[in-house]
């Protein structure tokens, strides 16, 4: 088995730098590219990054890359890779995804079929199995992906399984919730730190508040999750347990937090409470049923983070316009507070009544959104009477 792997952490557009910082914080050098962060590591790195990365989507092993302008080149390129170092006899290895962009090969089902045939032939040769008899695929699953960009094929194995945004604490969700990894990334892009008050005035199922509490408490986001690699014979159960135990020991149970989530919908408030309970942070967050226009605070240097309803999520345009105007009026007196508002509404600033200090383009799934950033006038707390 291999001792070092070429690895990729995939990321939503606009979040690559956040994921890169997280990878470096774990001690791995990396290169940030569009939609991905490349790094190298051993089996422990595979476990740690799946367990700890908050903003990434998946961790993939790069088995190899090669030119592939024809199906013959694709077959020979896949066949030449060292599959015996990854796939034990009996493994299931579906070619779960093929993607062709700006390439001569563009029939994705054919790319999948030929890649599968090449892997089968390589394993038959390595394990001395007759070519005419199909391999028994009854063991652990290794999902293989083939990406062909500008006639260069990259072949990968997904180590994650269910996407990393599925933390395992969501009991229920609202109509269009923000993904957990997107919420964690926005918190890291904001100027919030655990010693500052945090309010989400349109909290829905509570994702921003829960992710903030998990960040503050140093809770590994994957601690409750299971991963594809846990079924693989060359990833030892002892090492997995060791990394999980180390992560559990890092949880900070002493820190005091000031996090509040509000929503006009009483049912969503109850869902948010249940989700926080499932995440183990119920005691860190105050959830209230409250309208945006009723929000007040005499605290300073806080942060407001909101993913309010917008056009694609709400059919009532007049209601959205009214909500944005109310936000502008209610947030204006909170001069020392920074505000971070995520919406796809390109007219948000005019409806809110103030231009943003900074705007950042992101994607919530396939939907293009902007993070409107308004920075507070920071003061020393003792200066405030």
Where on the chain are the PLM-derived regions?
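A short, flexible beta-alpha/helix-coil linker loop
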Residues: 100-103, 162-163, 309-313
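SAM-dependent Rossmann-like transferase core, predominantly class I methyltransferases
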Residues: 155-189
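Conserved S-adenosyl-L-methionine
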Residues: 178-296, 312-313, 317-319
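C-terminal catalytic and target-recognition region of SAM-dependent MTase-like enzymes
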Residues: 290-385
């Amino acid at each position: 088995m291999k001792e070092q792997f070429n690895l990729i952490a995939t990321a939503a557009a606009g979040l690559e730098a956040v994921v890169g910082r997280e990878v470096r914080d774990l001690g791995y050098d990396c290169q940030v590219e569009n939609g991905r962060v490349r790094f190298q590591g051993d089996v422990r790195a595979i476990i740690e990054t799946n367990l700890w990365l908050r903003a990434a989507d998946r961790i993939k092993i790069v088995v190899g890359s090669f030119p592939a302008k024809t199906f013959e080149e694709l077959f020979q390129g896949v066949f030449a890779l060292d599959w015996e170092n990854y796939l034990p006899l009996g493994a299931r290895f579906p070619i779960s995804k093929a993607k062709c962009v700006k390439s001569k090969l563009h029939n994705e089902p054919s790319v999948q079929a030929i890649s599968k045939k090449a892997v089968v032939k390589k394993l038959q040769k390595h394990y001395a199995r007759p070519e005419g008899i199909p391999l028994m695929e009854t063991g652990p699953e290794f999902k293989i992906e083939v990406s062909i960009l500008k006639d260069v094929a990259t072949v990968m194995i997904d180590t994650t399984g269910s996407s990393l945004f599925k933390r395992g604490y969501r009991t229920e969700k609202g109509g269009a919730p923000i993904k957990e990894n997107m919420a964690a990334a926005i918190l890291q892009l904001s100027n919030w730190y655990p010693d500052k008050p945090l309010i989400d005035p349109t909290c829905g199922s509570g994702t921003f508040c829960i992710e903030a509490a998990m960040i503050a408490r140093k809770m590994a986001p994957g601690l409750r999750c299971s991963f594809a690699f846990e079924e693989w014979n060359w990833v030892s159960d002892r090492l997995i347990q060791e990394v999980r135990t180390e992560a559990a020991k890092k949880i900070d149970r002493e820190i005091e937090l000031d996090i509040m989530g509000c929503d006009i919908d009483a049912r969503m408030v109850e869902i948010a409470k249940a989700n926080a309970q499932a995440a183990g942070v119920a005691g860190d967050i105050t959830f209230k049923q409250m309208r945006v226009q009723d929000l007040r605070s005499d605290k300073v240097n806080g942060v407001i983070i909101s993913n309010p309803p917008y056009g694609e999520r709400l059919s009532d345009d007049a209601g959205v316009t009214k909500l944005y105007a109310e936000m502008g009026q209610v947030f204006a007196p909170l001069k020392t507070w920074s505000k971070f508002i995520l919406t796809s509404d390109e007219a948000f600033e005019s409806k809110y009544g103030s231009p943003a200090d900074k705007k950042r383009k992101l994607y919530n799934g396939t939907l293009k959104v902007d993070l409107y950033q308004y920075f507070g006038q920071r003061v020393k707390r003792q200066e405030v009477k």
